[in-house]
């Protein structure tokens, strides 16, 4: 970061000549100089080039107006105003809080001024670099000889082998120098929360509005287990979202606790709704306790916020209503909600403390922000036992944590601070909104069919759109007022074939075809439903990527309308079974899969599969204990009724458990099995469309098999 912007020239010698001298002096110190044509040009430069580290301008020409506009973009950026003896310095005490320095126009002072600018630039870079990352950068630059782990010794070992050299050249020297041992005392300890690691935790907590934050280097799957192991002791009961991530299902297998399921809604499209308000009432919880063996009043609750499809809760209502001492919001998909006003009141850390309750929020920093994979955070607000919690933290944390991941977590937080952070999130929201409008425009202009978007009819302004009772766009028949809200950056594209109420048309285009088409053109879909595709507009999505997706959708329509051969349109799919797809055209394939969905009454089957939960014969923990003792056997999927499942079964998409360990499918919950068998049948009819079902394995004959407990009824 070495770019200085200079506003000028001014057409007068006494101003232009000192600036020319300063330009030469700055270049000799390694700075790159750019010359914006005017203030509009400058502001565009700053907005789109974060590597600019200073602005030089004439005070008489631009004064505080320019400073204020720059501060809206980056309040930390150093500003250098040049004045003459007649300049009026109408600067208030508040204005002096800006990073603003004054210099006089004079010849012969260029080197001295350049030295000062170099100093202020270093201070700026030091100021925006968070504490642990700064310490890690410093250590990596020192190049100390170490006789401890890791064995690659800052990458030296890699350069002693041809494959190692390839690895070194790909990742680069700094990445490997930053991969250091916990033996480096000046970097402190992640496990003991000392030194720069402690400073990083405090820095992150301030940034995210938490009272305490913990950095986790092996994903939110682990963060969820840490919180659960602390909050729900053996023998206790907890409330848990049935839409939970499988890491929470694994927590139930690890901990001897009794789960009470909070049952969410779904619409006919298969989009996951939230947990309705009625599930949070004392009466509802009391009924669950009374109906569940060994259950007591719950000590802890786990809510998935947001849902996979981007629905956020009014978390302030939940925190006040839910009568449990400890609430965990699994917010893996929304680590950005603290940084834009449209998300106010929709995150775990929003608002003040709730008397008598502790609030936990886990976030996958890597999912939608700029952090390395497995980067995760735990935020806490409320009273808790810090020493006991840290035991749970250490229980699940490696004694050799990845310091590059730690630095990436902290840097992700640094990127969100101040006006630059707000602008970063706002740009993501605006880009998603623009994309939504473009799809709407193309749909309106199309003379036949085009894709639709799951959203209200009017989306003129950026907001979290409420899922309001009585409106038809969302497809939820029993929506609650002021409860669930659609996140604008989670964009769900709808394909023809089914509407939000589950009415299936004569013809349709299953979303899996579109996903395969896009994938072959370098566009990867986050989630594919029967007739919908989910795209995430994270802060890394730029205009080029958004336009690439739009182009991919229009190219699919063009190819589909031409009814191209599968061989030409989807060559990777064709390669799965050339004999089967040899003469097939894309419309024949689409209508074949669509016909299967209609025959099985897909929307009705999906709703029934999630309407009645299977019977819990034993807790997931008890079922796991039976499994590790070897008390399991394998049966075909269609033999599952009446047997107690040893594993969780969850199809992708959407990755939500249909059957938990210790549960049994009964006649009342038979739709669970019918739904799974329907998913399997599509892959049996059409090669390349096999369903991924966690907990079920497909043998060589194409039969899905599952594990059940022996002698359990």
What are these language model-derived features?
Residues 1-4, 50, 211, 234-235, ...:
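A short, charged/proline- and glycine-enriched loop
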Residues 2-16, 238-241:
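Short hydrophobic beta-strand segments
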Residues 13-30, 39-57, 64, 70-72, ...:
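Non-catalytic terminal extensions of PLP-dependent enzymes
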Residues 36-45, 58, 65-68, 76, ...:
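Conserved PLP-enzyme active-site core in the AAT-like
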Residues 163-254, 260:
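Long, structured ligand/cofactor-binding scaffold of large enzymes
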Residues 214-216, 301-304, 533-538:
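Short glycine-rich or small-residue beta-strand-to-loop segments that form or flank ligand, phosphate
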């Amino acid at each position: 970061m070495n770019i200085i912007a200079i506003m000028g020239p001014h057409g007068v010698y006494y101003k232009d000549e000192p600036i020319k001298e300063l330009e030469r002096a700055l270049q000799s110190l390694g700075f790159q100089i750019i010359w914006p044509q005017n203030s509009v040009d400058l502001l565009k430069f700053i907005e789109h080039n974060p590597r600019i580290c200073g602005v030089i301008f004439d005070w008489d020409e631009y004064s505080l107006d320019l400073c204020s506009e720059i501060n809206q973009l980056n309040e930390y950026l150093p500003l250098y105003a040049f004045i003459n003896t007649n300049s009026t310095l109408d600067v208030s005490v508040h204005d002096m809080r800006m990073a603003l320095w004054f210099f006089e126009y004079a010849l012969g002072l260029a080197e001295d001024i350049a030295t000062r600018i170099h100093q202020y630039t270093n201070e700026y870079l030091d100021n925006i670099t968070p504490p642990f990352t700064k310490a890690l950068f410093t250590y990596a630059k020192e190049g100390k000889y170490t006789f401890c782990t890791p064995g690659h010794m800052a990458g030296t070992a890699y350069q002693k082998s041809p494959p190692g050299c390839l690895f070194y050249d790909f990742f680069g020297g700094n990445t490997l120098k930053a991969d250091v041992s916990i033996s480096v005392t000046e970097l402190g300890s992640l496990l003991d929360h000392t030194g720069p690691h402690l400073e990083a935790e405090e820095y992150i907590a301030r940034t995210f509005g938490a009272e305490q934050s913990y950095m986790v280097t092996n994903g939110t799957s682990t963060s969820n287990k840490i919180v659960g192991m602390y909050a729900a002791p053996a023998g206790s009961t907890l409330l848990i979202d049935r839409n939970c991530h499988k890491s929470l299902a694994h927590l139930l297998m690890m901990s001897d606790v009794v789960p009470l399921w909070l049952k969410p809604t779904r619409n006919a499209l298969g989009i996951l709704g939230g947990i309705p308000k009625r599930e949070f009432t004392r009466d509802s919880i009391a009924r669950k306790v009374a109906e569940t063996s060994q259950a007591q009043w719950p000590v802890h609750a786990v809510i998935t916020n947001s849902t996979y499809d981007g629905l956020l809760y009014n978390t302030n209502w939940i925190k006040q209503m839910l009568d449990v001492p400890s609430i965990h919001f699994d917010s893996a998909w929304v680590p950005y909600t603290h940084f834009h006003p449209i998300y106010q009141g929709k995150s775990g850390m929003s608002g003040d403390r709730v008397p008598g309750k502790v609030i936990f929020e886990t976030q996958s920093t890597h999912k939608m922000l700029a952090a390395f994979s497995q980067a995760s955070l735990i935020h806490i607000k409320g009273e808790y036992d810090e020493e006991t919690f840290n035991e749970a933290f250490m229980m699940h944390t490696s004694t050799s944590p990845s310091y590059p991941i730690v630095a990436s977590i902290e840097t992700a937080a640094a990127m969100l601070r101040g006006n630059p952070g707000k602008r970063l999130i706002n740009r993501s929201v605006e880009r998603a909104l623009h994309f939504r409008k473009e799809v709407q425009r193309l749909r309106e202009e199309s003379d036949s069919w085009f894709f639709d978007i799951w959203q209200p009819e009017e989306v003129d302004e950026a907001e979290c759109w409420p899922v309001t009772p009585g409106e038809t766009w969302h497809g939820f028949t029993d929506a609650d007022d002021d409860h669930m809200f659609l996140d604008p950056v989670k964009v769900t594209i709808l394909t023809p074939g089914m509407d939000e109420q589950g009415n299936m048309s004569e013809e349709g285009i299953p979303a899996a075809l579109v996903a395969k088409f896009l994938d072959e053109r370098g566009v990867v879909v986050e989630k594919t439903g029967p007739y919908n595709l989910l795209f995430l507009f994270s802060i890394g999505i730029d205009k080029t990527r958004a336009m690439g997706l739009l182009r991919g959708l229009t190219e699919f329509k063009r190819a589909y309308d031409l009814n191209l051969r599968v061989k030409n349109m989807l060559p990777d799919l064709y390669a799965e079974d050339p004999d089967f797809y040899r003469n097939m055209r894309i419309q024949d394939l689409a209508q074949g899969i669509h016909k299967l969905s209609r025959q099985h009454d897909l929307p009705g089957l999906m709703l029934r599969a999630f309407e009645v939960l299977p019977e819990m014969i034993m807790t997931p923990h008890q079922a796991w204990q039976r499994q590790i003792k070897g008390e399991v056997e394998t049966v075909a999927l269609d033999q599952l009724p009446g047997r107690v499942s040893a594993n969780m079964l969850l199809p992708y998409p959407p990755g939500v458990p249909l059957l938990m360990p210790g549960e049994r499918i009964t006649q009342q919950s038979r739709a669970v099995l019918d739904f799974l068998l329907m998913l399997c049948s599509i892959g049996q009819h059409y090669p390349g469309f096999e369903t991924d079902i966690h907990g079920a394995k497909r043998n060589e004959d194409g039969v899905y098999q599952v594990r059940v407990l022996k002698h359990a009824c």
